[in-house]
Regions:
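Gly/Pro/Ser/Thr-rich low-complexity, intrinsically disordered segments predominantly at protein N-termini
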Residues: 1-194
Length: 194
């Protein structure tokens, strides 16, 4: 059965977050998530594992999750069925407060999106603006070469002085080196070789 073309806030809140299948909701519109390539999946898994391995036992406490629902602020719109915004980022790093789809955005320290041919425009424009407006401190975008066969670079964005826009902190080539919220060095080879 096909989902309705729009999803209201009330319908979303009345159901379990994972009951709608592979969709995102943008201003109430249902947007289907496309199946990803094997390389995309490999990079997401390896990067999430590297981030988990970078957590320090002494803290601070961070959780690393992949493809979990994150509800962003509702759109400013007078129609109740055009407001809901739910994304499933490839990877999130958040504090250890209990997970709640409606408030988790306030606990996220870093979001990572791994681009694909079907998500490139959204990952590099729309989501970058949305995540910054939500006040998420860091955003990484993993890019592939023109053949989509290997990682070419990772753009690292951090909030600017306003706390509402991202600026490029670094463009990583050959290795991702992070100092916050976790200290991590991961070569592109480690993230993508079978």
């Amino acid at each position: 059965m096909e989902p309705p073309p729009r999803l209201t806030v009330a319908d979303y809140l009345a159901a379990a977050p994972d009951s709608f299948g592979d969709i995102e909701v943008v201003d109430g519109r249902i947007v289907r998530n496309m199946a990803q390539t094997e390389l995309h999946s490999l990079v997401v898994r390896r990067l999430a594992a590297a981030l988990e391995g970078a957590r320090l036992p002494a803290g601070p406490c961070y959780r690393v999750s992949a493809d979990v629902a994150v509800r962003f602020r509702d759109a400013v719109n007078s129609s109740p069925d055009h407001q809901l915004n739910v994304r499933y980022p490839d990877i999130i790093v958040r504090d250890c407060d209990p997970y709640d789809v409606n408030t988790v955005r306030d606990h996220i320290q870093l979001i990572i999106e791994v681009t694909s041919e079907s998500t490139f425009e959204t990952d590099t424009t729309t989501k970058r603006v949305q995540y910054a407006a939500a006040g998420i401190p860091g955003y990484l975008v993993v890019h592939f070469d023109k053949d989509w066969s290997k990682i070419s670079e990772v753009e690292e964005y951090r909030l600017d002085w306003s706390g509402r826009r991202y600026v490029v902190r670094a463009v990583h080539h050959r290795a991702l080196i992070l100092d916050e919220p976790l200290r991590l060095t991961a070569t592109f080879e480690d993230l993508q070789l079978p």
